[in-house]
């Protein structure tokens, strides 16, 4: 997860898994929220029995998969990460499950999981990606934790987002920018917009902030 920071020569805390994990500047875990490995196994058994599709497990900085298909290969290319063989021995907490499948399958799985399981946050990060986390996980909680730890006022913070799991963060920070390529509901909920990801919207917004 930290290779982006390494490439940019940035040494700073990093929030991952929609706020489920925070690593400090030395890659040490300082904040962690997830569900039990028992819950992860229940979810895994259900998904495999009814849908027979690959399931990704995220545990701290490990990405583990039970099998590799085209979707997993594409995710590996996008992230620059190499998946590990699934091994839950010694694991006590899972930060996230990810299912990559056809949009119709993802829709049906999302509905069935929400009916069958409680205490979880289940959402589509895109049409073919279904993410499953503990219901306590949020980006706003992670930001609040970091601000308290670093003694930074929320009015001094800036955030950028394009999807529904960004909304709580965008509403919490001093300035929250919705990316032009964001989901319609995000654009309607957040009054301040910037250019799209492809148009370097983050840089554009920061340049304007510096000029204020």
Residue ranges and their predicted role:
Residues 1-71:
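Active-site phosphate-binding/coordination module
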Residues 46, 50-160, 164-169, 181:
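Conserved acidic, metal-coordinating active-site core of Asp-based
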Residues 1-5, 109, 113, 170-173, ...:
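Hydrophobic packing residues within well-ordered alpha-helices of enzyme cores
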Residues 15, 158-160, 177, 194:
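Hydrophobic/aromatic beta-strand patches that form the interior of the parallel beta-sheet core
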Residues 1, 40, 94, 106, ...:
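A general structural signal for well-ordered alpha-helical segments in protein cores
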Residues 2, 44, 144, 187, ...:
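Predominant activation on well-ordered alpha-helical scaffold segments within soluble catalytic domains
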Residues 8-10, 18, 116-118, 172-173, ...:
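Short, structured coil segments at secondary-structure junctions
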Residues 172, 176-212:
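Asp-based, Mg2+/Mn2+-dependent phosphohydrolase catalytic module
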